[in-house]
């Protein structure tokens, strides 16, 4: 096939065999967020480039290397969103929904775009679910976000495979003092740093802490610690968060090198990580960004949020074999009809069943075919039961119900009793 007719490298099709697990995951998250009082917001996938330069930071890897940026026909510089927080802040500012101190607890879902090197768990188009809260500045809301994700891991059956890492970045003033001390320490050891860290030292020194280079990591062992430069306000906030996590029974580790890759974070930052996915171990991350709204032209507004990568979490569910059987099975009942009269009767009968059992996944054979071919398709569909309607069943106004996944003989069920029978053996288990 011509390359121009293939998916772009790092941007993948999600095929019908994969979507049931995606829908299961997305539905589980959506129900949880609804239960906690969060409301969905939907933003465009394209924004003015300046939005991300102002919010993420011009000297970050995302802005410098990874954004998909282009000029439209009006000459405006536009960018496919690389993350969701900046777009969400822009939306709440544009529509004034945080004015007057209104608390907003929002969530969104959709694709993000970064021109990174594709590998397992990292793609150029990837999907995130993000949560943002505005006008709440206490550690209680930070804790709620983490407690909520902890509950999600329990619902998905993956708690034992993830670990919570925490840090506090302090206020911008505290970070400035720390940055000065870190630069002084690293500048004296410049020849021991890898090339990328030398560049970051000039543009974004805190990102050196995030290095994966062994020699630079060795240099950082004796580097100044951010915790020693925290302001009192941030220290009290962080202690309040830890106390709440302890009360909720959520285990965590303090990672003093956790700084996140975006300039807008302050105070709390956190990541949920796993060792089950190789190098791409972060499955959910977030933190507080109290200065971002003001930085983007609004009034001082507290903000905190997180984003989780759907691809990585779906991959983790598959790796841990936490895919519910009913998710893997896309069809409950498959109906085989033989002859035009049976097909017409089947149409009326199945629609009546759907009226009475709206959650039943009932597939009707299309394209006619012999008994053998239809039954083969019924078996291949993964259905629990095949319904059989031929001339004899039509004359007697019954339908054959044959188990496909277990013991038991075929039964003939009267049409009027079909819904009740399927409810007892399929819907109610």
From Swiss-Prot:
CDD domains: HisRS-like_core. GO terms for molecular function: ATP binding; histidine-tRNA ligase activity. It catalyses: tRNA(His) + L-histidine + ATP = L-histidyl-tRNA(His) + AMP + diphosphate + H(+). Pfam families: HGTP_anticodon, tRNA-synt_His. Keywords: Aminoacyl-tRNA synthetase, ATP-binding, Cytoplasm, Ligase, Nucleotide-binding, Protein biosynthesis. Its main location: cytoplasm. It is found in: Cytoplasm. One of its GO terms (biological process) is histidyl-tRNA aminoacylation. It is an enzyme of class 6 (ligase). PANTHER family: HISTIDINE--TRNA LIGASE, MITOCHONDRIAL-RELATED, HISTIDYL-TRNA SYNTHETASE. NCBIfam families: hisS. Homodimer. Belongs to the class-II aminoacyl-tRNA synthetase family. This is Histidine--tRNA ligase. The lineage of its organism: Bacteria, Pseudomonadati, Pseudomonadota, Gammaproteobacteria, Pseudomonadales.
